[in-house]
Each structure stands twice: as structure tokens, then as C-alpha cells.
């Protein structure tokens, strides 16, 4: 977790990201789901037994810059996350998280939905 916080503190908005490279298939990822609007894949640094990300193919750097036109797409990410969680056997529950900005732990400036499960989640999370 400390490593993720360190990454978030030095991450900068703007420019191409690792997620853009994954969308374009320039670098490999363990893809769970893909359609014309989004991509779901396993996190390379899992924080739970099951930890995957759902990202839009449209570049939106962070939730604070999303606008009303993005509403359907952002909802679609949650529905895809729910379906992937079911496909991966997360029957007892899971957590969906979107990090916003450096203080919120955002380490990649391409909005992404974390889905974590396979263990009891703690509260508060941070």
C-alpha cells in the first residue's frame, strides 16, 4: 500500500498513460473483458486476492474532469465491474473504488474503477 501512495504522490495528470498502452495492446495485460467502450483486466499489483480494473477506452484523466456526457460511460464501468466480479466468483461481496488525485491515491491519470474482493474488506479503507 505504501508503494501505491508513493506512486500517487509523483503521478501527474495529462499525457499518455500505461492504460492507453494497454488499450492499444502495446503492452500485455490479463484481460477479463473488453467491449467498444471499456476494458477490464487484472491489476499488476493486487491489493486483494481478486483485484481488477475497469477502464474506459475514452481518455478521462480523473473523475473531477468528467462531464455530463460521460454519465453513461461511467455507469457502464460499474455494470461491467459487477459482471466481471460475478464471473470471477466474488459471491460474498467486493469493493469498487475510484481514486481521485494525489491525496486520493490516484497513481494513473486515466480514470479507472478498482474492484477488489476475495477477502473481508476493512473500514475505513485508508
UniProtKB/Swiss-Prot annotation:
BP terms from Gene Ontology: intrinsic apoptotic signaling pathway by p53 class mediator; positive regulation of calcium-mediated signaling; protein desumoylation; proteolysis; purine ribonucleotide catabolic process; regulation of DNA-templated transcription
Example GO molecular function: hydrolase activity
Protein name per UniProt: Adenosine 5'-monophosphoramidase HINT1
Gene: Hint1
Intrachain disulfide bonds: none
Phosphoserine modified-residue sites: 45, 72
Enzyme class, first EC level, given as a word: hydrolase
Modification sites for N6-acetyllysine: 21, 30
Known outcome of mutating residue 87 to V: Loss of desumoylase activity
Outcome when changing residue 116 to Q: Significanly reduced interaction with SUMO2
Known partners and oligomeric status: Homodimer. Interacts with CDK7. Interacts with RUVBL1 and RUVBL2 and is associated with the LEF1/TCF1-CTNNB1 complex and with a KAT5 histone acetyltransferase complex. Identified in a complex with MITF and CTNNB1. Interacts with CDC34 and RBX1, and is part of a SCF (SKP2-CUL1-F-box protein) E3 ubiquitin-protein ligase complex. Interacts with SUMO1, SUMO2 and RGS17. Interacts with the Ten-1 ICD form of TENM1. Interacts with CALM1; interaction increases in the presence of calcium ions.
Motif stretch (Histidine triad motif): 110-114
Biological function: Exhibits adenosine 5'-monophosphoramidase activity, hydrolyzing purine nucleotide phosphoramidates with a single phosphate group such as adenosine 5'monophosphoramidate (AMP-NH2) to yield AMP and NH2. Hydrolyzes adenosine 5'monophosphomorpholidate (AMP-morpholidate) and guanosine 5'monophosphomorpholidate (GMP-morpholidate). Hydrolyzes lysyl-AMP (AMP-N-epsilon-(N-alpha-acetyl lysine methyl ester)) generated by lysine tRNA ligase, as well as Met-AMP, His-AMP and Asp-AMP, lysyl-GMP (GMP-N-epsilon-(N-alpha-acetyl lysine methyl ester)) and AMP-N-alanine methyl ester.
EC code: 3.9.1.-, 3.4.22.-
Reactions this protein catalyses: adenosine 5'-phosphoramidate + H2O = AMP + NH4(+)
InterPro entries, sorted: Histidine_triad_CS (IPR019808), Histidine_triad_HIT (IPR001310), HIT-like (IPR011146), HIT-like_sf (IPR036265)
